[in-house]
Amino acid sequence: MANGPTHQFLIFKIIPIDIGGIDFSFTNASLFMVASAVLSAGFLYFATSARSVIPGRSQSVAEMAYEFIASMLKEGAGTKGMKFFPLVFSLFMFVLTANLLGMVPYFYTVTSQIIVTFALALLVILTVILYGFIKHGFGFLKLFVPQGVPGILLPLVVIIEIISFLSRPISLSVRLFANMLAGHITLKVFAGFVASLGTLGALGIGGAILPLIMTVALTGLEFLVAFLQAYVFAVLTCMYLNDAVHPGGH
């Protein structure tokens, strides 16, 4: 159905590119990923390019975002984890900007695509693994051996810990993807009710009031969810990075 609630998630090619039978086309999803990266980086650049003792609104927002992520990273991974600040801050700003762009009518929500969120989650986990082995060598494997576990239970616990670790990119990506997908589908459904009832005359307009109120309320809620999901993604990233910095800390 062309105007169905899932139509907004369709991917179409803007610039078809085929190399050796592999599709590298530039799509609407690609466009909004680039837009999210450029807008977030551009905002931070212009907000901090003319720094002053008494900050303006844009500089205040940029500084609040910086302090917010810095505090989160220190709490989640300690002072040694601050070396990962550029990664966590970039991920937070990208996800937040992508989520907010998706709230604009007719714009594409790239975080509603599991392949996008999984790529971001995979980047986090690969960073944890690479840094863990580079910094600690095989000592990184202490991560899978919790302290205080009886020897008879250790093999089972190690298997559970490994499975839990490998499932992290799945849970991290699905959480973001599912929340954005479900929220936008719900908004589309209620907005569709309003549009359909509005065509039925006076009676329909009266019946459209409740769905309209619900749509406005859900829109406000989705803006909150857009921030919360970026926050949750960043918090979990900090927790996972803590395992790379302190593999024997649990």
Curated annotation (Swiss-Prot):
Superkingdom to which the source organism belongs: Bacteria
A GO term for molecular function: proton-transporting ATP synthase activity, rotational mechanism
Pfam families according to UniProt: ATP-synt_A (PF00119)
Localisation: Cell inner membrane
Entry GO terms, CC: plasma membrane; proton-transporting ATP synthase complex
Listed InterPro entries: ATP_synth_F0_asu, ATP_synth_F0_asu_AS, ATP_synth_F0_asu_bact/mt, F0_ATP_A_sf
Keyword Cell membrane: yes
Family: Belongs to the ATPase A chain family.
Protein name: ATP synthase subunit a
Protein's organism: Rhizobium rhizogenes (strain K84 / ATCC BAA-868)
Gene behind this protein: atpB
